Amino acid sequence: MCRLGADVTGIDASEKNISIAKLHAKKNKLNINYICTSPEKMKSKKKFDVILNMEIIEHVEDVNFFLESCSSLLKKDGIMFVATLNKTLKSYVFAIVGAEYIMRWLPIGTHEWEKFIKPEDLINISNKKKLKLKKLDGMKFNLLTDKWKLSPDKSINYIAQFVKY
């Protein structure tokens, strides 16, 4: 987004992640404002046009408060994307057993299945936070090409696009 001319602010609750992101931005000559915080703790008078919550909501303690906080940071008619894991047996097998224990792509304990969220639950909570669903797609990872693509299958990963009203 920065390369396309957008004014970008990136936040993360982890100082380590912010440090890595800053190094990446510097290496790629990107002007990104990074802040070590979370939506729940962020005090900003500035409202954002777009919020990307990519693979984060399945790690937060209070989904209601998280989405309320994100909504409060989003401009009216702003867009928020949420990419996350569905709460299914298949997602447990692939995202936890497969990715953490078998493939070792992620440290064991990265995910807690109890925090995974079904699309309909995400949509219901978001509606209460003035966020209306615009689009919902599944996402699939292709091991051979090492790439993600959109899919009608939402049983493991999915991405939702919301608009603030």
PLM region spans:
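Conserved SAM-binding loop
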Residues: M1-S91, P119-L122, A160-K164
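Residue-level recognition of beta-strand->loop/alpha-helix junctions
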Residues: D12, D137-G138
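A short, acidic/glycine-rich surface segment
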Residues: S19, L143-W148
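Short low-complexity, flexible loop/linker segments enriched in glycine and/or proline
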Residues: H24-L30, V97-G98, W148-P152
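Acceptor-substrate binding/catalytic loop of class I
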Residues: T84, Y101-D121
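Short, flexible, mixed-charge acidic loops at enzyme active sites
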Residues: S91-Y101
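Short alpha-helix
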Residues: W113-L136
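Core SAM-dependent methyltransferase catalytic element
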Residues: D146-Y165
